[in-house]
């Protein structure tokens, strides 16, 4: 949801990746990024 909902890019910075990373951090993961519209958290 975070990747599709916030698919915005400003000066090369993807806002959706920041939202995805925050989502993953909230789940006690080490961050994450969007891959083909899906938020993928790092372990």
UniProtKB/Swiss-Prot annotation:
Disulfide bonds listed in the record: 3-34, 20-39, 24-41
One annotated Gene Ontology cellular component of this protein: extracellular space
Main location class: secreted
Gene3D superfamilies: Knottin, scorpion toxin-like
Organ and tissue specificity: Hemolymph.
Keywords: Antibiotic, Antimicrobial, Defensin, Disulfide bond, Immunity, Innate immunity, Secreted
Family per similarity comment: Belongs to the invertebrate defensin family. Type 1 subfamily.
Name recorded for this polypeptide: Holotricin-1
